[in-house]
């Protein structure tokens, strides 16, 4: 059984017991989080597709950890002009473990 949920403006395919990284959620470590924006639920041959969301669909997850991703380096450079700008960015994420899929 798996579901497709919408979180942080992105779609994620999730299954029970799966651990995945999402955009930062405002929830404490160990807290339960519910995702009610379920786009699709599949259980074998039984497929439910929402328009846009599955009615009564809910995915429950537990927050495992918060952290920051790898650094992305940004460089702006203009040739022959002695002009160079450097910046870096580390995106915050929340790691969750899917505990239940209800549809």
From Swiss-Prot:
GO terms for cellular component: cytoplasm; ribonucleoprotein complex; ribosome. The keyword Cell inner membrane does not apply. One of its GO terms (molecular function) is structural constituent of ribosome. InterPro entries: bL21-like, bL21-like_sf, Ribosomal_bL21, Ribosomal_bL21_CS. NCBIfam families: L21. Part of the 50S ribosomal subunit. Contacts protein L20. This is Large ribosomal subunit protein bL21. It comes from Tolumonas auensis (strain DSM 9187 / NBRC 110442 / TA 4). The gene is rplU.
